[in-house]
């Protein structure tokens, strides 16, 4: 970045903003880059501003029981805020004084007042000077207030972020990511531009009092008639505003429903294409869009009337003010013109400035109160450690993620010093914890010496992660004692990658040691992966490590933990994403050898790890099921260990699958014995995978899983109203905000039966905001959210004993960020955070306007109609002016007088022109109030938006995956949310306002030109100057706005990234580093925003200067060239003043239109995306009600009796090569093999070898070369949809969209209920569906969060059965499944797909046993294609993964005598069907 010219600018340069000329010149000539932006002034740096506000806030916390954030802000910014407010007031006062001078100028032309004619020129000079003074006062004042608003936002941004890093895990558990994003986006944005309006709360009353005093002098009591009308108008507009909000609130829910489905479609676009659901999804979204547009039109019409009310009110204000006075006393022309000028100022003040100011204060105070509540939430407390301790001890520890009643009691006791409570009462409260919630850990005891390995095992939700959190201090124990040294390193269960290089992610701020670094890289098997990158370990990873596979991310996270030299290493399921071979090697080389002398606590379910551990701790439902060595486990719990070892190849399972088996085993062999499980308990067990309330609750914000991004809306339930909810003070209404929601269902179900909560699940979702649609959080994993927090909101006790010296010393004692700032490179920041640069022009091209206008032919006719009406108005005006000009004046004797004859109503020929000034200037807007022009325009523009949305949706659904893979999901979603919202809401009314203002100006200029042709000559260069200046400014401003928008996303991305890795950050003590990184992102955004504000003010000031010159010319031309006509001078000067304000408004509207049209450009860019080859011919399919569907439906050829293709499922692959992009490197090369009909083929290979890619290539989802034939039919000879319908698919990423069970199983509505129930029965889904109210009509939300992963897999299986496909592709179908659900899938595959060809990608060994052939993929090529016997006889990858003992298990029929003592997994089949269903539920 360059040094800012502002630092060396003179006072004059600062006053006129001339220091921005270099950037304006550069932006006009070439495209601006980040390096062209000026550095921010030191006073605007986030470090300085946050330090200043934090110091004042700490003082406020220390000095008062009820600290107020507004007091801290007042001490920081008040005097500058008031200084600019006074400047603003003085500038507004000049507006009130100008009409006085105008009246004196008109009076000087009075035939009876000729002595004042000589001073008219001096009055003209005074009037011009007032305009100059106003310009010099207003613009610095407005810029100064914007600047202060920006500084307040920066300071509060930083304060919120720092507080977020300090929040306790319990508080984070109760706050959704949406609320944090709302704090940073919705609320704080109000300060930036809103602060300039805040002063009008006191300026407008003073201004109205001054104006009414001046009008009183002219018109006496009748002046209040006009004021009364304005007040009524303001109230009318407020009523319209409330009506508009009502429609918008109703519409918000509909928008949300559409965006939920759209986001699910975008996230699962590969599955949508694999299922051939493009038309079904398009129809579903378009139906929701139709309902949404009905409410959009209503809101737009109300807003249209609200906007028009301002335009037409001018005439009535003047008319109502003047008419009573004229009827009673008569009036002179001077008073009419002076009143007009006063009323223009009065109208703006009462109907615009004051309501805006009140709204600004309301919004700002509400935002400050929300932030204040957030800043007082409970902070994370680090435990006191003994650095000399070498052992880890836990004695009788019990802990709750929920606050216990005893803790609430302690807080209440602190807040009420008068209340005394005995120790007996404390014991009573602590003993009643169980009444309020289940402890996540209870009565845990263990002790491990230095250098020992403790393996922690247990079922999902048993409390394994909570145990590690308690050791780290994230979870406070309610009872018991924890003892360790405090030097901890931590590896999270969900691998977390910070933005930066691989090396920075591993070192993570620790001093660099080359030998240690290389040792860790080798031990974690990262050397081979790093060598593949051109930049080696200096390759920059984006947010969430999106360039890496899951296994690579897991190994980097593990390497980070191992690299840090600590006494205690906490490893939370670090091997979950690794294949069998890699897991074995890393466990041996890293955990057992490299860390042999360190104390380690490893969360695992792998039997091999349990055998090698020094101690084993098995948890079950928060309690210690077993603690001891592995030999003791075998002796004390032989049933447990034999049961685990009885599962075929249990050691080969991933961590998640082993967890599922442990869950089942612990349930059967619990401490209570083998008592039968009641139906209620079984049902509770059924949702344990997705609804566990203890262990999983903390995941709401700290440990996100499954990257599905959705928008959601929630209506507050009574349960939420009682809970800790950030927005609990807001009325019960729908609010929109952007929030990444989760696929998991922990938080959607309260801790009661699903039956009772079923009806409330529909559309009860966390609120979400459209402002965040400009941010790039889309690629990260999503965050869980809470809906059932039921504890009271209790604030922290004030720190009354903290002195100012303590506060300051606390600031100094924190780790400084000076050395950290050197580590952060701005180019790295750009690579880490920024979205893809938009390749659209800086200024909207004429081609975009032309294309937009021609989208709908009606729009062209409407615009022509608008122009015809305007020309008719101008023509009528000119005809009447000509008629009056050629009509002889009335005889003086016919002049009318009032009854008392004291005041004459002067009627002259020129005064009659005033009537037509009103007609030309105002009649245009009066007609707009009717249905002649405005409403058809708004209506048609919304129709254009509807067409563009439909075209874009169709284009995205038909685009090839190679194109979609280059786009971020959030970027696509922004087009459907942010840009479509602009097309629906802002663009139609902005275009209407611009056309309206433009026609008013042209009409006024036409009248002036007729009255005084010389002034028309002066108008031409002004218009030319305006067009040139606008073009010059627009080129730079739009680029700056784009850079500012790109610079905003890193702030929110960094927030989400920090939250995902918060436990890791705290364990490594890297909060100061991330605060500095956050400040860097803030400073980058500030640099762009400050420059945009400065250049905008430069432009506004230049426009005003041009108009001041124009007004000077008009004034002197009219004074010097006009003869005796006071009416002519009055009309010209009044119109000139009106033209100045209106044309400036029109200029700003034109810039707004150009800015909003960029959204149209982005939409056109998506509409122009290429489509997939082999687009199928679509035919309409009549629905049951006989109506034709607007969306074409694909008919399934396999349901026909004369089924021709595919008949057998024979598949031949010849020289198949697959690439992600057309010119990219091949991912698979020269794959050739053939499959016989009905054969089962297993795909083998390491993680990332290309197994899933091969399945995608079969479906033609990639750029492919070569040929595939099914039953002799080549894929080139049929359409893409026909080809894909030949396959049934069970993808790795399960796709459940928001809709009914029926829609999810049969989106094209091809099957009857009986057929769907039959298939549901086959796959074991019937009992699941019957548990829900409405059964098949029950609406699933949040990706089917009320279903376990196994149930979702069964849904996919049911879809494949319904499709009657001949070839079935299965990509990890058993991932995350419990044994019972897995057995059901195996049984269904055998029965329903007995005659089908099955291609299986699976890590479970026993699943592969049923395959006749195996395809081994290595280094992008087929290495082997043989039977399992041949693979085991050779030195193959498959053989390496199988231990000798496992090979014995693979062939029990050959080694029956050796296997008699081994329990078989077939034992599960002995259960009755009821037991199977109950276990699944």
Swiss-Prot record:
Keywords: ATP-binding, Cell membrane, Chloride, Chloride channel, Endoplasmic reticulum, Endosome, Glycoprotein, Ion channel, Ion transport, Isomerase, Isopeptide bond, Lipoprotein, Membrane, Nucleotide-binding, Nucleus, Palmitate, Phosphoprotein, Repeat, Transmembrane, Transmembrane helix, Transport, Ubl conjugation. It is an enzyme of class 5 (isomerase). Residues 654-831 are annotated as: Disordered R region. Pfam families: ABC_membrane, ABC_tran, CFTR_R. N-glycosylated. Phosphorylated; cAMP treatment promotes phosphorylation and activates the channel. Dephosphorylation decreases the ATPase activity (in vitro). Phosphorylation at PKA sites activates the channel. Phosphorylation at PKC sites enhances the response to phosphorylation by PKA. Phosphorylated by AMPK; this inhibits channel activity. GO terms for cellular component: apical plasma membrane; chloride channel complex; cytosol; early endosome; early endosome membrane; endoplasmic reticulum membrane; membrane; nucleus. Its EC number is 5.6.1.6. Residues 81-365, 859-1155 form the ABC transmembrane type-1 domain. The modification Phosphothreonine is found at residue 717. Residues 423-646, 1211-1444 form the ABC transporter domain. The keyword Isomerase applies. The chain crosses the membrane at residues 78-98, 123-146, 196-216, 223-243, 299-319, 340-358, 859-879, 919-939, 991-1011, 1014-1034, 1096-1116, 1131-1151. A lipid is attached at residues 524, 1396 (S-palmitoyl cysteine). PROSITE patterns: ABC_TM1F (PS50929), ABC_TRANSPORTER_1 (PS00211), ABC_TRANSPORTER_2 (PS50893). It is found in: Apical cell membrane; Early endosome membrane; Cell membrane; Recycling endosome membrane. ATP binds at residues 458-465, 1245-1252. Residues 1-77, 147-195, 244-298, 359-858, 940-990, 1035-1095, 1152-1481 are cytoplasmic. It is a multi-pass membrane protein. ATP 2 binds at residues 1220, 1245-1252. This is Cystic fibrosis transmembrane conductance regulator.
């Amino acid at each position: 970045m360059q040094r800012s010219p502002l630092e060396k600018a003179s006072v004059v340069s600062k006053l006129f903003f001339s220091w921005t000329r270099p950037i304006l010149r550069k932006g006009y000539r070439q495209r601006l880059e980040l390096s062209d932006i000026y550095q921010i002034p030191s006073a605007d740096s986030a470090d300085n501003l946050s330090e200043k506000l934090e110091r004042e806030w700490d003082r406020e916390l220390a000095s008062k029981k009820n600290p107020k954030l507004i007091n801290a802000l007042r001490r920081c910014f008040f005097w500058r805020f008031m200084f600019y407010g006074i400047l603003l007031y003085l500038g507004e006062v000049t507006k009130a004084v100008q009409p006085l001078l105008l009246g004196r100028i008109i009076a000087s032309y009075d035939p009876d007042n000729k002595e004042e004619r000589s001073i008219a020129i001096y009055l003209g000079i005074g009037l011009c000077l007032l305009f100059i003074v106003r310009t010099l006062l207003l613009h610095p004042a407005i810029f100064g207030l914007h600047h202060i608003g920006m500084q307040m936002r920066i300071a509060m941004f930083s304060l919120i972020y720092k507080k977020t890093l300090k929040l306790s895990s319990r508080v984070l558990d109760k706050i959704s990511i949406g609320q944090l994003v709302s704090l940073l986006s919705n609320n704080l944005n109000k300060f930036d531009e809103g602060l300039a309006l805040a002063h009008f709360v006191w300026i407008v009353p003073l201004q109205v009092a001054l104006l009414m005093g001046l009008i009183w002098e002219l018109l006496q009591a009748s002046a209040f008639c006009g004021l009364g009308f304005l007040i009524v108008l303001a109230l009318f507009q407020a009523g319209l505003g409330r009506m508009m909000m009502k429609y918008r609130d109703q519409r918000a829910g509909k928008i949300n429903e559409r965006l939920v489905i759209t986001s699910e479609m975008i996230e699962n676009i590969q599955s949508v294409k694999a299922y051939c659901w493009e038309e079904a999804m398009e129809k579903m979204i378009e139906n929701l869009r139709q309902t949404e547009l009905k409410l959009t039109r209503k809101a737009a019409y109300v807003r249209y009337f609200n906007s028009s009310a301002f335009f037409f009110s001018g005439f009535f204000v003047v008319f109502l003010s003047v008419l009573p006075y004229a009827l009673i006393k008569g009036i002179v022309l001077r008073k009419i013109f002076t009143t007009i000028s006063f009323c223009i100022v009065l109208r703006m003040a009462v109907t615009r400035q004051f309501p805006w100011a009140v709204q600004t204060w309301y919004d700002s105070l509400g935002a400050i109160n929300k932030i204040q509540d957030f800043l007082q939430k409970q902070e994370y407390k680090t435990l006191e450690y003994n650095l000399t301790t070498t052992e880890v001890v836990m004695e009788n520890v019990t802990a709750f993620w929920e606050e216990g009643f005893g803790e609430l009691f302690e807080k209440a006791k602190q807040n009420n010093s008068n209340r005394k409570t005995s120790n007996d009462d404390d014991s009573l409260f602590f003993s009643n914890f169980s009444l309020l919630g289940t402890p996540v850990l209870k009565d845990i005891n263990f002790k491990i010496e230095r250098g020992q390995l403790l393996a922690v095992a247990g079922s999902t939700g048993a409390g394994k992660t909570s145990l590690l959190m308690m050791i780290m201090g994230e979870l406070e124990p309610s009872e018991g004692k924890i003892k360790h040294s405090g030097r901890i390193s931590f590896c999270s269960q969900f691998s977390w990658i910070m933005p930066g290089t691989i090396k920075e992610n591993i070192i993570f701020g620790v001093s660099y040691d080359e030998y240690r670094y290389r040792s860790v890289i080798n031990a974690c098997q990262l050397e081979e992966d790093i060598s593949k990158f051109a930049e080696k370990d200096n390759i920059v990873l984006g947010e969430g490590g999106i360039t890496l596979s899951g296994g690579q991310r897991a190994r980097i996270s593990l390497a980070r933990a191992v690299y840090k030299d600590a006494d205690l290493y906490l490893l939370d399921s670090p091997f979950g994403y690794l294949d069998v071979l890699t897991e074995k090697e890393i466990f041996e080389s890293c955990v057992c050898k490299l860390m042999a002398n360190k104390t380690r606590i490893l969360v695992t379910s792998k039997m091999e790890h349990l055998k090698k551990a020094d101690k084993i701790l098995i948890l079950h439902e928060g309690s210690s099921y077993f603690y001891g060595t592995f030999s003791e486990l075998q002796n004390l719990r032989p049933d447990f260990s034999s049961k685990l070892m009885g599962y075929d190849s249990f050691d080969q399972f991933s961590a998640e699958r082993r967890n599922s088996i442990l869950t089942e085993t612990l349930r059967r062999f619990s401490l209570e014995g083998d008592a039968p499980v009641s139906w209620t308990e079984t049902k509770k067990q059924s949702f344990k995978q997705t609804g566990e309330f203890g262990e999983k609750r903390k995941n709401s914000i700290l440990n996100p899983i499954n990257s599905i991004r959705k928008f959601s809306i929630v209506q507050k339930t009574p349960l939420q109203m009682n809970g800790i909810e950030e927005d609990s003070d807001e009325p019960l209404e729908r609010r929109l905000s952007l929030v990444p929601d989760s696929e998991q269902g922990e938080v959607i179900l309260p801790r009661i039966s699903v039956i009772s909560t079923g009806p409330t699940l529909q559309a009860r979702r966390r609120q979400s905001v459209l402002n965040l649609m400009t941010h790039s959080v889309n690629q990260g994993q999503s965050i869980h959210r809470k809906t059932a927090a039921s504890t009271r909101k209790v604030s922290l006790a004030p720190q009354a004993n903290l002195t100012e010296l303590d506060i300051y010393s606390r600031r100094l004692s924190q780790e400084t960020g000076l050395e950290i700032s050197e580590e952060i490179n701005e180019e790295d920041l750009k690579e880490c955070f920024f979205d893809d640069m938009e390749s659209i022009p800086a200024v909207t091209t004429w081609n975009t306007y032309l294309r937009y206008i021609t989208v709908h032919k009606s729009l062209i006719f409407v615009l022509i109609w608008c122009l015809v009406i305007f020309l008719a108005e101008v023509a009528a005006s000119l005809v009447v002016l000509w008629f009056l000009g050629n009509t002889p004046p009335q005889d003086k004797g016919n002049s009318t007088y009032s009854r008392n004859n004291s005041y004459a109503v002067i009627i002259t020929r020129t005064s009659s022109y005033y009537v037509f000034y009103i007609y030309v200037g105002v009649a245009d807007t009066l007609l707009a109030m009717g249905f002649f022009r405005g409403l058809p325009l708004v209506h048609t523009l919304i129709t254009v938006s509807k067409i563009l949305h439909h075209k874009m949706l169709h284009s995205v659904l038909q685009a090839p995956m190679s194109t979609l893979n280059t786009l971020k999901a959030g970027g696509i979603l922004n087009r459907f949310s942010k840009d479509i919202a602009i097309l629906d809401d802002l663009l139609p009314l902005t275009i209407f306002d611009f056309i309206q203002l433009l026609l008013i100006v042209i009409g006024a200029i036409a009248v002036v030109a007729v009255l005084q042709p010389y002034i028309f000559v002066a108008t031409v260069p002004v218009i030319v100057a305006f067009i040139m200046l606008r073009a010059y400014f627009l080129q730079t401003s739009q680029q700056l706005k784009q850079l500012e928008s790109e610079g905003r996303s890193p702030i929110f991305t960094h927030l989400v990234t920090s939250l995902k890795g918060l436990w890791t950050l705290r364990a490594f003590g890297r909060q100061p580093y991330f605060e500095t990184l956050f400040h860097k992102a803030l400073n980058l955004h500030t640099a762009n925003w400050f420059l945009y504000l400065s250049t905008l003010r430069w432009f506004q000031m230049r426009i005003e200067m041009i108009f001041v010159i124009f007004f000077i010319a008009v004034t002197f031309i009219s004074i010097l060239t006009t003869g005796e006509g006071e009416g002519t001078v009055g009309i010209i000067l009044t119109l000139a003043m009106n033209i100045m304000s209106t044309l400036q408004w029109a200029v700003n509207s034109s810039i707004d239109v150009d800015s909003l049209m960029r959204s149209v450009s982005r939409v056109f860019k998506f509409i122009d995306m290429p489509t997939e080859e082999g687009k199928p011919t679509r035919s309409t399919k009549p629905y049951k009600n006989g109506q034709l569907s607007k969306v074409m439906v694909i008919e399934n050829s396999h349901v026909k009796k004369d089924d021709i293709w595919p008949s057998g499922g024979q598949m031949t692959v010849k020289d198949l090569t697959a690439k992600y992009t057309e010119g990219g490197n091949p991912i698979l090369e020269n794959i050739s093999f053939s499959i016989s009909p009905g054969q089962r083929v297993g795909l083998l290979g390491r993680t990332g070898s290309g197994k899933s890619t091969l399945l995608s290539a079969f479906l033609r989802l990639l750029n492919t070369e070569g040929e595939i034939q099914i039953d002799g039919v080549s894929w080139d000879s049929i359409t893409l949809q026909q080809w894909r319908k030949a396959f049934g698919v069970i993808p790795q990423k399960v796709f459940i969209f928001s809709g009914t069970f029926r829609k999810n199983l049969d989106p094209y509505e091809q099957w009857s209920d009986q057929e769907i129930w039959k298939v549901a029965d086959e796959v074991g889904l019937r009992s699941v569906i019957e548990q829900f109210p409405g059964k098949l009509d029950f609406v699933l939300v949040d990706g089917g969060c009320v279903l376990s992963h196994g149930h979702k897999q069964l849904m996919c299986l049911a879809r494949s059965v319904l499709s009657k496909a001949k070839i079935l592709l299965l990509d990890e179908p058993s991932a995350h499944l419990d044994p019972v659900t897995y057995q059901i899938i195996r049984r269904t595959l055998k029965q329903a797909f007995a005659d089908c060809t099955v291609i299986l990608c699976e890590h479970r060994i026993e699943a592969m046993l049923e395959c006749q052939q195996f395809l081994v993929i290595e280094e992008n090529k087929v290495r082997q294609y043989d039977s399992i016997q041949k693979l085991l006889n050779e030195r193959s990858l498959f053989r390496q993964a199988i231990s000798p003992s496992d090979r014995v298990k693979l062939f029990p029929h050959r080694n029956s005598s050796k296997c008699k003592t081994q329990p078989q997994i077939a034992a599960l089949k002995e259960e009755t069907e009821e037991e199977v269903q109950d276990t699944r539920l």
